[in-house]
Amino acid sequence: MHHTNKKKYGQNFLTDVNLLNKIVTKASITDKNVLEIGPGKGALTKIIVPQAKNVLAYEIDATLKPFLNFENHNNVNIIYDDFLKRDLLKDFDHYFSPNSQLSLIGNLPYYITSPILFKIIDTPQINDATIMIQKEVGMRLLAQPNNKNYNALSVIIQFLFSIEKIQEVKRHMFFPTPKVDSIVIKLTKNNNILPTFLKQFIKFVKNSFKQKRKTLLNNLSCQFLLSKETIIPFFLQHHIPLQIRAEQVTLETFQKLTVKWFIFLNMS
């Protein structure tokens, strides 16, 4: 079968069988309900289907249907549509039993990695995600303070998930060969987060990193429309250096500051 790869969908197919098996092993999907994003020609799907309880895959390119023929298996369904545009709750109600927890697996198109990550965050049924992403993005997710890759996404993802680096993947392991290297990571959700606090945390972190060259003090002043003179007592009270930048602040400190900041705002 012949298929013309479509650049607009970021199609780069992984060809290394050993790595495909490693990804599935690390995902720990035996007898679990699985979502796959972008099955492509089915290289990963063929390994997942015999092991999983049920598989629901989203493939945007309907011309790949001939490669995704699983008529001999009654535990797999493929939706030919854009994952980002789907009402996942409706899909889950249709294909899975109520209150099912799901494991996500996939080689994510580089150009839509962040939107997919935020859709995973917003979908409580997804418990963990074993994903291949652009190495540069992966290094941001794994980055620690005082590292050039450390940003708002690093902090938010590390707050919401425990992150395991599985393997870096060289570009020559794909066909066609992409211009960048990749990395496989596993994200496991922290399910003990109150929705109200999460909303405040994301808002505080995003505003803290709003302009990277500015200090934390300047960013908070600009984004929350407060004078620096109003905010300085808050910094002094909580022993925060006035010249500190967001990329120097640890995840633990961001968590503590979020609580204190919104109390401070309510009192201001």
Curated annotation (Swiss-Prot):
TM region(s), chain numbering: none
EC class name: transferase
EC numbers for this chain: 2.1.1.182
GO molecular function, one term: 16S rRNA (adenine(1518)-N(6)/adenine(1519)-N(6))-dimethyltransferase activity
Catalytic activity: adenosine(1518)/adenosine(1519) in 16S rRNA + 4 S-adenosyl-L-methionine = N(6)-dimethyladenosine(1518)/N(6)-dimethyladenosine(1519) in 16S rRNA + 4 S-adenosyl-L-homocysteine + 4 H(+)
One matching Pfam family: RrnaAD
Alphabetically ordered keywords of this record: Cytoplasm, Methyltransferase, RNA-binding, rRNA processing, S-adenosyl-L-methionine, Transferase
GO terms for cellular component: cytosol
Binding positions for S-adenosyl-L-methionine per the UniProt entry: N12, L14, G38, E59, D82, N107
Subcellular location: Cytoplasm
Sequence similarity: Belongs to the class I-like SAM-binding methyltransferase superfamily. rRNA adenine N(6)-methyltransferase family. RsmA subfamily.
Function: Specifically dimethylates two adjacent adenosines (A1518 and A1519) in the loop of a conserved hairpin near the 3'-end of 16S rRNA in the 30S particle. May play a critical role in biogenesis of 30S subunits.
PANTHER family reported for this sequence: DIMETHYLADENOSINE TRANSFERASE (PTHR11727), DIMETHYLADENOSINE TRANSFERASE-RELATED (PTHR11727:SF7)
Protein name: Ribosomal RNA small subunit methyltransferase A
Organism: Aster yellows witches'-broom phytoplasma (strain AYWB)
Encoding gene (name): rsmA
